[in-house]
Amino acid sequence: MIIGVPKEIKNNEYRVAITPDGVKELCARGNRVYIENNAGLGSGFSNAEYEDMGAEILYSPKELFEKSEIIYKVKELFPEEFDYLKEGQIIFTYIHSNAFREQTDALLEKKVIGIAYEDITDKNNEFPLLKPMSEIAGKGGFLMAVQCVQKINGGNGLMLADVCGVKKAEIVVIGAGNSGLGAAELAASLGNKVTVLDINTVKLERAKEVLPKGVEFLYSNKKNIEDCIKKSDVLINCILWPKHRTDHLITRDMLKLMKPNSLIVDVSCDEGGAIETCRSTSHDNPVYSEGGIIHYCVDNIPSAFSQTATTSLCNATLPYLIEIASKGVRKALCENEHLRRGLTCYDGVLTLEETGLKQKRPYSSPEEVLNIV
């Protein structure tokens, strides 16, 4: 198949969907790969490195979309890309259709086949294409906290590392998933006092097995959260709040319980979600203060670690892309139920129930549109 890799156009997005080694894998299987000019520079990969592995460089995103059967990306599509879409084209990326109604309109209108990384499952009913970015986002979120608490950056002047004779900084991590484990592991390894909260006791038990000794694990309820945020120097949120809920885990009033000028890092960054006062920021302008508390709410933290993130993401997504390219998209979707869970739209039909309910659109199941009995 013909696979096109465009340059990401989101603000401060330095990742790219594929590494040169990934191109080599695709070309060895008879696929043709187009890379947009300088698409990999932000991740440390030159045009020449891609060409050496068999890719062809195109200098126009319009031409790349026109020539490609599969568009292989990192982030969602932006309005300036909508007109490039063509009927039957496969869009393989993080789509996040719930959050971007205009994108959903375009995908349906153009009758493309959208397959979202974030919804693909595995045999354990987990999300293998979220895991690599979640881990990097969690660890990256803590590394950003290290900078934000420095006095020169407007923080309280703390060092988030163990210093002999000095009280340890208190790091509270909400969520024991991949992001939370990443944040807690790094924070604990530097000698901070770390507390992890989750409503899932199985996740807490797993976290206890892998995290360093000394980390405290608490069931996430209102009292425990309030007790923890009173003492926290850094609060790191790593849970995605259910989209149908209108309440919040950390309300605006609860900020009054926190130490003045302490820090919230919202790795999940779902506006109006777990943290009421969260609103998305960018790497250009990452923090703001509300209620006397510093908020760091950048919604693409992994982009700051672009070379690592690109390599990790490509390692995770490439086997699925190879399956689609080898079998053809319909056969791949019919034979692989886990890949099928990622189907967002097909031939003008929305196939993701969650988006249908949220955006009040008609939808069908993937099995219905693929005529799977």
Name each model feature, range by range.
Residues K67-S68, S232:
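An anion/phosphate-binding loop that grips the pyrophosphate of nucleotide cofactors and donors
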Residues E209-G292:
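Rossmann-like adenosine-cofactor binding region
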Residues Y34-I57:
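N-terminal beta-loop-helix "entrance" segment that forms/cooperates
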Residues E118-M144, C148-M159, K168, C269, ...:
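Adenosine-phosphate binding glycine-rich loop
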Residues E69, K75-E76, I95-H96, N221, ...:
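Short glycine-/small-residue-rich Rossmann-like dinucleotide-binding loops
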Residues P6-K7, N11-G42, I152-L240:
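Glycine-rich phosphate/diphosphate-binding loop of Rossmann-like nucleotide-binding domains
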Residues V23, N47, T104, F142, ...:
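Generic hydrophobic/aromatic pocket-lining and core-packing "Φ" positions
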Residues I70-V149:
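Phosphate/diphosphate ligand-binding glycine-rich loop within oxidoreductases
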